[in-house]
């Protein structure tokens, strides 16, 4: 069997109904769209949230909150991710070079998820209390 010889099983594919081809087809005249109305017209698509002209829910409710710009340039990384690195010195440049964080990230915090078995040096990164204890227990240090 080759890819160019494969075909669907008999009866697996249904031919599509041809619309507007006489009343004998079952889909003639109005082509299954009913009579008149907004949805019977061509080019019709009622957008999500449309409530028939009444002010929709997303406009009746007040706005709240905002998106912090800081969230786009900060991230957290797990302690387990650091154990994948070969370098003993961990800083922002090292993490970007190893593709652990995107290039646009400016601030990183190391959190305690997973464990680390070798001594590493963390330079100019924020570290949670638990991660700090784990790094120091493995013989590493935080600068």
Curated annotation (Swiss-Prot):
Pfam families: Ribosomal_L27A. It comes from the Bacteria. Residues 21-31 have a biased composition (Gly residues). InterPro entries: Ribosomal_uL15, Ribosomal_uL15/eL18, Ribosomal_uL15/eL18_sf, Ribosomal_uL15_bac-type, Ribosomal_uL15_CS. Gene3D superfamilies: 3.100.10.10. One of its GO terms (cellular component) is cytosolic large ribosomal subunit. Keywords: Ribonucleoprotein, Ribosomal protein, RNA-binding, rRNA-binding. One of its GO terms (molecular function) is structural constituent of ribosome. Residues 11-20 have a biased composition (Basic residues). Residues 1-48 are annotated as: Disordered. GO terms for biological process: translation. HAMAP family: Ribosomal_uL15 (MF_01341). PANTHER family: 50S RIBOSOMAL PROTEIN L15, LARGE RIBOSOMAL SUBUNIT PROTEIN UL15M. Belongs to the universal ribosomal protein uL15 family. Binds to the 23S rRNA. Part of the 50S ribosomal subunit. This is Large ribosomal subunit protein uL15. It comes from Baumannia cicadellinicola subsp. Homalodisca coagulata. The lineage of its organism: Bacteria, Pseudomonadati, Pseudomonadota, Gammaproteobacteria, Candidatus Palibaumannia. The gene is rplO.
């Amino acid at each position: 069997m080759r890819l160019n010889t494969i075909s669907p099983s008999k009866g697996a594919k249904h031919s599509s109904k041809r619309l507007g081809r006489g009343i004998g087809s079952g889909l003639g005249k109005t082509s299954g769209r009913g009579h008149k109305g907004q949805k019977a017209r061509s080019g019709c698509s009622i957008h999500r949230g449309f409530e028939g002209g009444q002010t929709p829910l997303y406009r009746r409710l007040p706005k709240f909150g905002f998106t912090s710009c800081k969230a786009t340039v900060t991230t957290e990384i797990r302690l387990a991710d650091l154990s994948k690195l070969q370098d003993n010195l961990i800083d922002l440049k090292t993490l970007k070079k190893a593709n652990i964080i995107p290039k646009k990230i400016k601030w990183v915090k190391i959190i305690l998820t997973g464990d680390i078995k070798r001594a590493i040096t963390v330079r100019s990164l924020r570290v949670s209390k638990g991660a700090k204890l784990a790094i120091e227990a493995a013989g590493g240090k935080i600068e």
